[in-house]
């Protein structure tokens, strides 16, 4: 499904709007710095390459073709999106540089208004975000809109990785569902940025 291809893209860029509402007493400056990895408004600068960690949480996870850090979780469960590839450039992502995603897949059913996605963002062991989003509202950020027609989908998006990304391991997972709670897809990505 394109909507979840958006989640492949949104798995790293999707939390932009919702992350702004996160507030933890006394930890806000630290959280803001960690969350800045998802902010696309930061200026460019030189940086070190992060390490992509291709470890899979469970026996039911499988890598998505394209040599990216994205894996399909719950792969044995029927999903409406057959994600064929996700290519990122540069690979691995670099601080202070633009990152281009190209995702390709086949959606087996139209996705209509009311679809939603559950997103978790972690910084190491710290859960920064657990929130449910309106999928159709979020995909407008990557120039798509509902209904999304079944069939072949290709999504390309360019985002900026802030130069101020704090070092550490970032884990993003997203599970998308139709308005009738039919499983669209589950994607997860893990990227580790080295110390500056």
UniProtKB/Swiss-Prot annotation:
A molecular function (GO) term: phosphatidylcholine binding
Keywords on record: Lipid transport, Signal, Transport
GO terms of biological process kind: intracellular sterol transport
Entry-linked SMART domains: ML
Residues that make up the propeptide removed upon maturation: 22-60
Signal peptide: 1-21
Pfam families per record: E1_DerP2_DerF2
Domain of life: Eukaryota
The keyword Glycosyltransferase is assigned to this record: no
A GO cellular component annotation in the UniProt record: fungal-type vacuole lumen
Family classification: Belongs to the NPC2 family.
Task of the protein: Catalyzes the intermembrane transfer of phosphatidylglycerol and phosphatidylinositol.
Subunit details: Monomer.
Protein name: Phosphatidylglycerol/phosphatidylinositol transfer protein
Source organism per UniProt: Debaryomyces hansenii (strain ATCC 36239 / CBS 767 / BCRC 21394 / JCM 1990 / NBRC 0083 / IGC 2968)
């Amino acid at each position: 499904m394109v909507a979840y291809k958006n989640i492949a893209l949104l798995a790293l860029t999707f939390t932009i709007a919702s992350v702004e509402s996160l507030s933890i007493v006394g930890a806000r400056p630290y959280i803001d710095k960690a969350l800045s990895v998802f902010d696309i408004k930061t200026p460019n600068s030189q940086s070190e390459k992060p390490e992509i960690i291709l470890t899979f949480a469970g026996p039911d996870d499988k890598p998505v073709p394209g040599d990216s850090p994205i894996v399909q979780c719950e792969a044995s469960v029927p999903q409406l999106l057959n994600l064929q590839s996700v290519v990122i450039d540069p690979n691995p992502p670099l601080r202070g540089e633009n990152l281009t995603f190209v995702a390709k897949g086949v959606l087996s059913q139209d996705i209509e208004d009311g679809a939603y996605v559950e997103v978790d963002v972690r910084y190491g062991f710290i859960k920064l975000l657990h929130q449910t989003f309106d999928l159709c509202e979020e995909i407008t950020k990557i120039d798509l809109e509902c209904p999304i027609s079944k069939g072949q989908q290709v999504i390309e998006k360019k985002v900026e990785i802030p130069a101020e990304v704090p070092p550490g391991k970032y884990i993003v997972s997203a599970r998308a569902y139709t308005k009738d709670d039919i499983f669209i897809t589950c994607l997860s990505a893990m990227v580790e940025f080295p110390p500056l």
